[in-house]
Amino acid sequence: MLGLAAEENVLRIHIDELVFGLIAFAVIFALVYRYAVPRVTKMLDERADAIEGGIERAKKAEAEAEELRQQFQEKLEEAHRSYAAELQKASEQSAAIIAEAREEAQAEARRIIEAAHAQIEADRQQAMAQLRAEIGALSADLAARIVGETLSDPAAQSRVIDRFLAELESGANQQAEVR
């Protein structure tokens, strides 16, 4: 019987222990609820705020980065446009300089050619004058030898020389026409 009585005690619930256990549980629950829960809640709220703040800061940083990227892209495009404009301007200036240099070279070439023609004409006139003088002297000597008298009158010498040269030129022109 002892064994049976002992088994009954094990299954039997003692009210005083149950009440004491419930009171102890309620006190511990109240203390945890009063002191620990607010601290944990506060810590969780702070952590949530920190996470939300981090997310907001990340979004802000991302927005700022995007804005900076767009500004950089705009400046880069502006630099490309400016470069293209400067390149076009330099190309136009070089074309203008080349055209101006070409015109100056052509003008200089025309001036040199005209000066050469003028010099050739002056040399020809000078040679003709010298030739006339020499031919005149030679023809006067020749006429004096043939006729036997000298042409001392300069006007007469000039007429003889002019007539002789005219005959030479007409003979040269006739030969040129025959060819």
Curated annotation (Swiss-Prot):
S-S bridge residues: none
Subunit organization: F-type ATPases have 2 components, F(1) - the catalytic core - and F(0) - the membrane proton channel. F(1) has five subunits: alpha(3), beta(3), gamma(1), delta(1), epsilon(1). F(0) has three main subunits: a(1), b(2) and c(10-14). The alpha and beta chains form an alternating ring which encloses part of the gamma chain. F(1) is attached to F(0) by a central stalk formed by the gamma and epsilon chains, while a peripheral stalk is formed by the delta and b chains.
Membrane-topology annotation of the record: Single-pass membrane protein
Annotated protein name in UniProt: ATP synthase subunit b
Record keywords: ATP synthesis, Cell membrane, CF(0), Hydrogen ion transport, Ion transport, Membrane, Transmembrane, Transmembrane helix, Transport
Coiled coil: none
Annotated GO MF terms: proton-transporting ATP synthase activity, rotational mechanism; proton-transporting ATPase activity, rotational mechanism
Pfam families per the UniProt record, alphabetical: ATP-synt_B
GO cellular component: plasma membrane; proton-transporting ATP synthase complex
Protein family: Belongs to the ATPase B chain family.
Transmembrane segments: 13-33
Record Gene3D superfamilies: F1F0 ATP synthase subunit B, membrane domain (1.20.5.620)
Localization (cell): Cell membrane
Reported function: F(1)F(0) ATP synthase produces ATP from ADP in the presence of a proton or sodium gradient. F-type ATPases consist of two structural domains, F(1) containing the extramembraneous catalytic core and F(0) containing the membrane proton channel, linked together by a central stalk and a peripheral stalk. During catalysis, ATP synthesis in the catalytic domain of F(1) is coupled via a rotary mechanism of the central stalk subunits to proton translocation. Component of the F(0) channel, it forms part of the peripheral stalk, linking F(1) to F(0).
